[in-house]
Amino acid sequence: MCIRDRFDIDPLILVSIVGIETNYGKRYSEYTVFNSLYTQIVSLPKRSSWATKELYHLLLYTKEQNISPFLLEGSYAGAFGYGQFIPSSFNKLSIDYNGDNKKDPYNWEDVLGSIAYYLTENGYPENNHNFTFRSPIWRSIRTYNRSDKYANTVIDFRNEISKRIFLSY
């Protein structure tokens, strides 16, 4: 089943998010996730509690998947995969979209399905194409990265892609 049919999410929003987050999978592994989170725990007192929770979720995920927590690579903040999920969000909101019994942060079907599910669970409305500032779609995108600038950039990128696709026909 097509992701758009299951979740009623504008596919260009998904394309925009993975483009911004990892340049479509080309840039997702600059740091070891374990080290990123541990460094925040010991070096950044304001982020220590948050990073401790995320490290716990990272360890849950790596144990479940039977992989070393020291091999998973991601961002300086501890996000990983093509969608750059933080461990707690990945554990809670990722899905096995392709049906192989694995929630894989490096499988495009699972990644796009997981982002769509995440946005839906965070208020992305059905049958809605209002991409304006502070609309329900904008708000759901903002939960993915708690920044007005991020949500605006995703929507601007989506609009630019849409314009270029339309102009090419």
Residue ranges and their predicted role:
Residues 1-2:
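Short, small-residue-biased leader/transition segments that mark boundaries at the very start
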Residues 6-7, 104:
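Alpha-helix N-cap/helix-initiation motif
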Residues 8-25, 58-63, 115:
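Short, functionally critical alpha-helical segments immediately adjacent to catalytic or ligand/cofactor-binding
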Residues 11-14, 30-31, 112, 151:
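Short alpha-helical patches at coil-to-helix transitions and adjacent helical residues
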Residues 20, 31-38:
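Short, conserved phosphate-binding/catalytic loop or strand-edge motifs used
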Residues 27-32, 73:
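Short, solvent-exposed loop/turn and secondary-structure capping segments
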Residues 29, 38-42, 95:
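Short capping/connector residues at structural and topological boundaries
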Residues 44-169:
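Non-catalytic cell-wall polysaccharide-engagement segments
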